[in-house]
């Protein structure tokens, strides 16, 4: 406001001092060049200042605000996934028709005071994201964490975020090449939790690199609050990049959307031990009956390969616990393992065809509760990228087959179509 007022006064002074006529003409002999330069400088400075303070808007990277003194930065992003689908039994009869906003999320990232003090906040508004926790707490918050980043190698965080256990879970649900993650990750994959996080990074894009990730968390999942069982979760993960890191953080994005010009590989392994967990799947699942708890261990091994539009991912993961079915109710801890393999090729950076095969194998003592000896799901997916993962259309077709199922009436075929839009 002060700057604008100065500009108006300067323009008025130009008219009065230099005797510019009503028709805009300057009387002969009057030299107004220097005065005009002064006025133009003020006007140009104001416009430049306004442009400098305007938010930066870029599709896929959100809306960013930062003052001219760089004392803070805030980036706002949102995304939504609208899904329709249908499931069919062995005789191709329709068993379910599905239409929903699968995800609707709002995210804030940035730093305060210094780029060394980073924060990340993410909220989820759909029923699957915001349904109450098993202990009845509000569950709107997905992420709320602050990091101290003393240099490019270290991150130290306190708050709620994804535990760094397996590749498939670390990938954002907005960066998938299928409508959703595999059945293997849905059962065995890690989840969000509250606690202390430490990360170490070494190397770069063109040379050997590694990442060492660890956390000590509450162990009961996101938004749990206080825990009275005395148990915590301890998680560690190591990632190796023999040929250097992926461009544009491609290790966290499915498919080779960057189109790596040289081969890139990631080899990863992780383990999470949840001491005295109150939930059937460690950081997620339903409550164990009564005051029951279990020590639950989850193990992970995965790899990624990308080269010129081709992408290959493989995941092996599982869970172990003592006496997983020793409860007075139907509750049980799913112990066993699973394998997921998927491959894709991106044509002209627009169309992607992907295939995936996922197998779940419960341990013998929990097979009666799981309802099968082996569950295998094969999926064919097609994605049309309009603006990368920020605006895309996805169609996938899944076929399910179970060995020794408890019921022969399980869904055999599922088709899903999803629109994803984000800023």
PLM regions and their residue ranges:
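Bacterial N-terminal signal peptides that target proteins for export
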Residues: 1-9
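Outer-membrane beta-barrel "beta-signal"
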Residues: 234-245, 382-384, 391, 410-423
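Outer membrane beta-barrel
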Residues: 62-222, 227-244, 263-266, 339-347, ...
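Bacterial N-terminal signal peptides
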Residues: 9-17
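Outer membrane beta-barrel transmembrane domains
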Residues: 279-280, 344-394, 398
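N-terminal periplasmic/intermembrane-space "pro-region" immediately following the signal or transit peptide
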Residues: 17-77
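Detector for outer-membrane/organellar transmembrane beta-barrel domains
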Residues: 229, 239-243, 247-363
